Curated annotation (Swiss-Prot):
Organism, scientific name: Prochlorococcus marinus (strain MIT 9312)
Lineage: Bacteria, Bacillati, Cyanobacteriota, Cyanophyceae, Synechococcales
Ranges that cross the membrane: none
Name of this chain's protein: DNA-directed RNA polymerase subunit beta
Assembly mode: In cyanobacteria the RNAP catalytic core is composed of 2 alpha, 1 beta, 1 beta', 1 gamma and 1 omega subunit. When a sigma factor is associated with the core the holoenzyme is formed, which can initiate transcription.
Disulfide feature: none
Similarity field: Belongs to the RNA polymerase beta chain family.
Enzyme Commission (EC) number: 2.7.7.6
Length: 1097
């Protein structure tokens, strides 16, 4: 094989651990964050100052969790540990000290995979990106078009302070967006004299106006300034000097109320070139004076002063699990503080102990609230390993303290030059969240201040130095360096070859000689996220389609027999490993035992290490989690080696779909508008068959009439229907069930009033009490079927926690195999998606010169306008690889190996493949990449040669079985009486505004009238219509829609005298059918029609 053909994966480095961002943050919380909060919280004094309670934060202790991860999932419990802290109660009067270890609450623990188990469900805490605390200088235009400058001091928590200038060169200050105050009033209130201020400013003449303005207002002393400040901040309250001092202290100088945080202090010191110590977290006089000085320099346009870009990643920081949890603990501890103070006041001083004072409930509630209902605590996307991994690396600008979808403008959502190597410019959702939810780039990491860093190699005098570890730079530091991209061509010693190199410097592009380059990127892949880096030939795809490709890989359903891609990018194995879906050995050793359930590795020290495999477990998205061993007894393994394949993995690599033979050609209109024509081979050979596991649950509750019972004795059910139930009335494992079959038999006690008349008659005649129960069994829903995989029974006797009022809970897991069918959605990795329109017998499919029928026929018109040509490169490279019987790894952005390298490489591979014996036909130099196909139905060749090859195609989670839905009668909305919407509500099909236009265009008047009346909210009309249909009579004239009556009532409630009148001017009583309607159900059913109504008149 020619050397030029084999330019494959040379990423230069392995990626860092992809879940590190989650794990490192939680580790910081356990080691520092929690201790920090407990120390800040301590000591607590009572209102008299006699008692003091100290928390010895560094001595906190975590108990071993009650359940392990698997048991917590099984029992619907939380995987959490109990927290204990040593508390010291000091009585200052007597000098008595009581020390005790106190329980302060349960802390959910992170699993090894970076997730949390909350109430049995696996959840992920998404990282949040927020504006960093610090000082920001901005310019604005006032209404006269004059440019004004302002400075905002933003703390981590506390009041914002904003300085601004006006046209008279006066300086004003606002506290938390209140009214403007002369800046010098604040200076005097803070105890600074005129000379203190003037001495600190480089251009005091600008500030002189503000001093004179304050003097003109008669504010000459500190006391007067405090009174003025109090008046402005608390209008309507009587001002006092002490009140002003208290207000100023609590707003800016009280560490409990105002906190810049470590990051805020770091940013302010850096921006204003100060040397205030890191542990001073409140405002200082120096901060305020330096801010005013900087603002004046901006006004006077003096060098060195620059405006801030709030979208720059140097000014936005990431809050990960640890910090979010720390903030929540702070909330809980503040609630606890109030309780402790109250108890100190109320209780007997002598007999009080720390345990009596500390109530764990507020802290438990705060933590529970965060994990259970915070916007950032999300139900993990477990569709496949990539979805799980991407979810853990997601960065959201939404959430508490962040942006909202409605408020976010274009600037926040846009790609910023500082995103380079930090946030992926491609992977983001389509729709309202575009640009607000991002993904961390492959090599990015979050530093101790929460800023995203990315690695570089140092360049010394034109030579790339790859010895040692790469250097990580944050966006601020990188701006001051000249950075070359990762695909710069170098010789084998690392010397840069070109004479002029494109570099990024201060967010602009320049060309400089190699000697001036400071750093070079680590890898061409470091700009993009993990999902995007799995797309081969990415550089040939339009960004919009690459975005769809990245997002759709996360929706790929794990298949029964996954197959890794013929054309990959070299990152597949690391994605599988870091996702946590594959078991990995932590020791060097030998495999001593393997079966489907466990693998035992005997370490070099002689100890046995057990790895238990997941078997057919249900994921959060109802896909199947199953692990299959890939090692044999006697195999030598090394630490970090994969022992088994998880779902959507093969050979330790991620395998989301199948490599199938694809032809790009139109076929009888069946691939019009992105539809896909597939061969029956995909169905018969189970290429795209997947297993889905549904969970069905039923509770036996305590009712007023007695307990519900789970039993086999169900009234009016034939013995045949009970065949698969055991003696308790629960379905046996392994049974095949279809829609309507009983899974769990349950009877509910029935009151006397529930008896139908015939039952009462039987009672009166025979005097015997028939069993007073109603059938309330759990049945398989419509359109569902499958095989019972597992049954779990939960009772209080076994120690299970059940919902209030429930005596027993039974869960049945049903697995179904879903073959590919018409209506399923499929996609490639380049954003080329479509719906299956027809499944053809393989003998009718177009076939190759050697007789092989193709698997999929796609429309060639889907390529040019979408500009995702990467799919064509993948197709031909896959064609060459399958004929050479090898797999290829192609790193994106391969121009570093020479111009047009992708094109040359694919061509060289095809030529190489055609040199195989008997394979000359696979490559035609006259028409490279195309073959003359024949029609399977006639055997005639098609007119034109067709592009054919192997591509990796995925089956997506949007399956037609989950979407198909029909309704004849069903539930109605209570207010409007219109049918509900959606499959889950058994809703109707909405004909919206545009569909109505279409009917209007055809003049379909009666159809339109039915849509507005009997098919919707004409309550009487729809009951009569159903009656007429059942009896075969003509449908009567429709009545008045309920929504019209609601509208009339709403207008009347506004005090408008509005009514409906006939042509003759007679008022129509819209409510005349109210009384008869009370007796008819709002939901027409066949039972509601009495037997007499069926009889012909």
């Amino acid at each position: 094989m020619s050397s030029s053909a084999l330019q494959v994966a040379k990423t230069g480095t392995y990626l860092p651990d992809l879940v590190e961002v989650q794990r490192a943050s939680f580790k910081w919380f356990l080691e520092k964050g929690l201790i920090e909060e407990l120390q800040n919280f301590s000591p607590i004094s009572d209102y008299t100052g006699k008692l003091e309670l100290h928390f010895i934060g560094e001595e906190y202790r975590l108990k071993r969790p009650r359940h392990d991860v698997e048991e917590a999932k099984r029992r619907d419990a939380t995987f959490a540990s109990q927290m204990y802290v040593t508390c010291r109660l000091i009585n200052k009067e007597t000098g008595e000290i009581k020390e005790q270890e106190v329980f302060i609450g349960e802390l959910p623990l992170m699993t090894e995979r970076g997730t949390f188990i909350i109430n049995g469900a696996e959840r992920v805490i998404v990282n949040q990106i927020v504006r960093s605390p610090g000082v920001y200088f901005k310019d604005e235009q006032d209404k006269n078009g004059r440019r004004t400058y302002n400075a905002s001091v933003i703390p981590n928590r506390g009041a914002w302070l904003k300085f601004e200038t006006d046209k008279n060169n006066l300086l004003y200050v606002r506290v938390d967006k209140t009214r403007k105050i002369n800046a010098h009033v604040l200076m005097r209130a803070m105890g600074l004299s005129d000379n203190d201020v003037v001495d600190k400013l480089r251009h005091p003449e600008f500030y002189q106006n503000s001093i004179e303005s304050a003097n003109d207002e008669g504010i000459n002393s500190e006391d007067q300034a405090l009174l003025e400040l109090y008046k402005k901040l608390r209008p309507g309250e009587p001002p006092s000097v002490s009140g002003g001092q208290q207000l100023l202290f609590s707003r800016f100088f009280d560490p409990k109320r105002y906190d810049l945080g470590r990051v805020g202090r770091y940013k302010i010191n850096k921006k204003l070139r100060l040397t205030v110590p890191d542990d001073v977290r409140t405002l200082t006089h120096e901060d305020v004076l330096s801010t005013i000085d900087y603002l004046i320099n901006l006004e006077l346009d003096i060098g060195g002063a620059s405006l801030d870009d709030i979208d720059h990643l140097g000014n936005r920081r990431v809050r990960s699990v640890g910090e979010l949890l720390q903030n929540q603990v702070r909330v809980g501890l503040n609630r606890l503080e109030r309780i402790i103070k109250e108890r100190m006041t109320v209780g007997e001083t002598d007999s009080l102990t720390p345990a009596q004072l500390v109530n764990p409930k507020p802290l438990v509630a705060a933590i529970k609230e965060f994990f259970g209902s915070s916007q950032l605590s999300q139900f993990m996307d477990q569709t496949n390993p990539l979805a799980e991994l991407t979810h853990k690396r997601r960065i959201s600008a939404l959430g508490p303290g962040g942006l909202t979808r409605e408020r976010a403008g274009f600037a926040v959502r846009d790609i910023h030059p500082s995103h380079y190597g930090r946030l992926c410019p491609i992977e983001t959702p389509e729709g309202p969240n575009a640009g607000l939810i991002n993904s961390l780039a492959t090599h990015a990491r979050v530093n101790e201040y929460g800023f995203i860093e990315t690695p570089f190699w140092k360049v010394n005098n034109g030579k790339v130095n790859k010895d040692g570890d790469p250097i990580y730079l944050s966006a601020d530091l990188e701006d001051e360096c000249r950075v070359a991209p990762g695909d710069v061509a170098t010789d084998k010693d690392g010397n840069i070859l070109a004479n002029l190199i494109p570099v990024r410097y201060r967010q602009d592009f320049e060309k400089v000689p190699p000697e001036q380059v400071d750093y070079v990127q680590l890898s061409p892949v470091q700009v993009i996220s993990v999902a995007t880096s799995l797309i081969p030939f990415l550089e040939h795809d339009d960004a919009n389609r690459a975005l769809m490709g990245s997002n759709m890989q996360r929706q790929a359903v794990p298949l029964l027999r996954p197959e890794r891609p013929l054309v990959g990018t070299g990152l597949e194995s690391q994605v599988a490993r870091d996702s946590g879906m594959v078991p990995i050995t932590k020791v060097n050793g030998t495999v001593s035992y393997v079966d489907a359930n466990e693998i035992v590795v005997k370490g070099e020290d002689g100890n046995e290490h057990f790895h238990y495999l997941q078997k057919y477990q249900r994921s959060n998205q109802d896909t199947c989690l199953n692990q299959r061993p890939i090692v044999n007894i006697g195999d030598q393994v090394i630490s970090g080696q994969v022992l088994a394949d998880g779902s959507a993995c093969e050979g330790g690599e991620i395998a989301l779909g199948q490599n199938v033979l694809i032809a790009y050609m139109p076929w009888e209109g069946y691939n019009y508008e992105d539809a896909i024509l597939v061969s029956e081979r995909m169905v018969t050979d189970d290429l795209y068959t997947s297993v889905h596991i549904e969970k069905y649950e039923i509770e036996a509750r305590q009712t007023k009439l007695g307990p519900e019972e789970i039993t086999r004795e169900i009234p009016n059910i034939s013995e045949d229907s009970l065949n698969n139930l055991d003696e308790m009335g629960i379905i046996r494992i392994g049974a095949f069930v279809e829609s309507g079959d009983i899974l769990v038999g349950k009877v509910t006690p029935k009151g006397e009033s529930d008896q139908p008349p015939e039952e009462k008659l039987l009672r009166a005649i025979f005097g015997e009490k028939a069993r007073d129960v109603r059938d309330n069994s759990l049945r398989v829903p419509k359109t569902e079927k499958g095989r019972v995989l597992d049954v779990r029974i939960y009772t209080r006797e076994q120690g299970d926690e059940l919902p209030p009022g429930a005596n027993m809970v039974v869960r049945v897991y049903v697995a179904q195999r879903r073959k590919i069918q018409v209506g399923d959605k499929m996609a490639g990795r380049h954003g080329n998606k479509g719906i299956i329109s027809r499944i053809l017998p393989r003998e009718d499919m177009p076939y190759l010169p050697d007789g092989t029928p193709v698997d999929i026929v796609l429309n060639p018109l889907g390529v040019p306008s979408r500009m995702n040509v990467g799919q064509v490169f993948e197709l031909l490279m896959g064609w060459a690889a399958s004929n050479l019987n090898c797999r290829v790894k192609v790193v994106p952005f391969d121009e570093m190996y020479g111009a047009e390298k992708s094109h040359q490489t694919v061509q060289a591979f095809l030529e190489e493949a055609s040199k195989q014996p008997g394979k000359a036909w696979i490559y035609n130099p006259e028409d490279p990449g195309k073959l003359l196909l024949k029609d399977g139905r006639t055997g005639e060749p098609f007119d034109q040669p067709v592009a054919v090859g192997y591509s990796h195609f995925l089956k997506l989670v949007h399956l037609v079985d989950d979407k198909i839905h029909a309704r004849s009668t069903g539930p109605y909305s209570l207010v409007t009486q219109q049918p509900l919407g959606g499959k889950a509500q058994q809703g109707g099909q909405r004909l919206g505004e545009m569909e109505v236009w279409a009917l209007e265009a055809y003049g379909a008047a009666y159809t339109l009238q039915e849509l507005l009346t009997v098919k919707s909210d004409d309550m009487q009309g729809r009951n009569e219509a159903l009656n007429a249909i059942v009896k075969g009579k003509p449908i009567p004239r429709p009545g008045t829609p309920e929504s019209f009556k609601v509208l009339m009532r709403e207008l009347q409630s506004l005090g408008l005298d509005i009514g409906v009148y006939t042509d003759e001017g007679k008022e129509v009583d819209l409510m005349q059918d109210i009384n008869p309607r009370r007796n008819t159900p709002s939901r027409p059913t066949y039972e509601s029609l009495g037997t007499s109504e069926y009889e012909e008149d």
